[in-house]
């Protein structure tokens, strides 16, 4: 009997603890595929979990609908060499990172993290995907976390440098792509007491802000198995090698009433 009880509990641990749960924030679009049964986390089917637009489905099915390819599962969709998952909560960066790790599909060899943007194509695709999920998206410039962060190391008494989440296999490569807004990164903000993270605006540009501000976010992880030459990261001191111009000229609006009530505003 004890062995049977253990076997029954293990699947629940795998599928239950890695999902947000129902009703955790405003919807931001229609569901993206039919649910596949009574799962324990939010699905991506109609009414089966928080969407990313006017759709407000609340439920606990674990949908298997997919966008951009079949290499991503459990509500994750493919952009380039990464699987993405849009989350419906505004969290501090560290809490967002933890939620991304917990939401990685079972059996994944690498951790998920707050979204990594290794190139201009990924940046464009992420913004276009946000726009496609709703007829109203981003006009009030709802900020989103990126995974880029610069943490203060109290032991070494220095900043660690701008880098992407540690779940990437190419962590030791330099930062080859940046899309900082004009006059960013603003090093005058760094006060040797707080860690700083990069948030993305509706144009895809990055701004330096303290990591303890709540913002909306998306998770990303390499396709499994990771492809060669995937992410560009930086464990060093954040030397910038390029700064592209703004990448999106048009935009649409978010459902501002719902989002603003969560304390997330523009730049």
Curated annotation (Swiss-Prot):
Keywords: Disulfide bond, Repeat, Secreted, Signal. SMART domains: CLECT. It is found in: Secreted. It comes from the Eukaryota. The keyword Zinc-finger does not apply. The keyword Signal applies. This is 27 kDa primary mesenchyme-specific spicule protein. The gene is PM27.
């Amino acid at each position: 009997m004890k062995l049977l009880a253990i076997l029954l509990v293990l699947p629940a641990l795998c599928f239950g603890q890695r999902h947000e749960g129902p009703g955790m924030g405003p919807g931001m679009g229609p569901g993206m595929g039919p649910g596949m049964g009574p799962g324990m986390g939010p699905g991506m089917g109609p009414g089966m979990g928080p969407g990313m637009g006017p759709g407000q489905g609340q439920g606990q099915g674990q949908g298997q609908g997919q966008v951009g390819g079949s290499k991503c599962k459990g509500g994750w969709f493919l952009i380039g060499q990464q699987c993405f998952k849009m989350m419906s909560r505004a969290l501090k960066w560290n809490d967002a990172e933890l939620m991304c790790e917990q939401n990685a599909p079972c059996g994944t060899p690498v951790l998920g993290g707050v979204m990594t943007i290794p190139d201009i194509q990924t940046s464009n695709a992420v913004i276009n995907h946000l726009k496609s999920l709703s007829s109203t998206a981003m006009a009030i410039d709802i900020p989103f976390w990126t995974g880029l962060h610069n943490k203060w190391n109290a032991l070494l008494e220095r900043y660690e440098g701008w880098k992407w989440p540690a779940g990437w296999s190419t962590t030791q490569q330099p930062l080859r792509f940046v899309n900082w807004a004009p006059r960013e990164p603003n090093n005058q903000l760094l006060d040797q007491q707080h860690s700083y993270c990069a948030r993305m605006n509706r144009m895809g540009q990055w701004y330096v802000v303290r990591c303890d501000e709540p913002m909306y976010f998306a998770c990303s992880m390499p396709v499994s198995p990771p492809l060669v030459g995937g992410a560009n990261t930086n464990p060093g001191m954040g030397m910038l090698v390029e700064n592209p111009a703004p990448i999106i000229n048009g935009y649409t609006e978010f459902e501002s009433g719902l989002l603003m009530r969560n304390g997330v505003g523009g730049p």
